Amino acid sequence: GTSQTVDWDLSEMNSQTINLKVNTDHNVGIRFINSSDPNDIEDITLEVIAEADEHQVFYEFADVSVNVTSASNDTKDGGRGVLLNSVWNASSIGTGLVRVYLIHEPTNFNATTRDGLGGNNDVAIDIPVSIVG
């Protein structure tokens, strides 16, 4: 398959578009990098893995329908996938956004909405999504 890397830059508040093919499984990995100090770039993903019981990645889609499941290589906490590695499958063609959250200390890991998860946003970013046939 093909691979795509999409960067989101806080200083520019924009991102490249994530391109998906409809009705196809896409293996998605996410990393959180703090590059606010170019002399001390920090991979926050390592902290999320070490503190998996205190974190959850959540994907909220607008104007597109995408099913997200935990990948077999995802970081797990008691069987629950943190969603650092996930599988996405879009059910229809279209364009929209995915809002990516890194949630600190969620209160309900089984919730299906951002509000239902509780906790605080460590990260909340919007990335354009394009789904083609």
Briefly describe each language-model feature range.
Residues G1-G133:
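First exposed extracellular module after export/assembly in secreted or surface-exposed proteins
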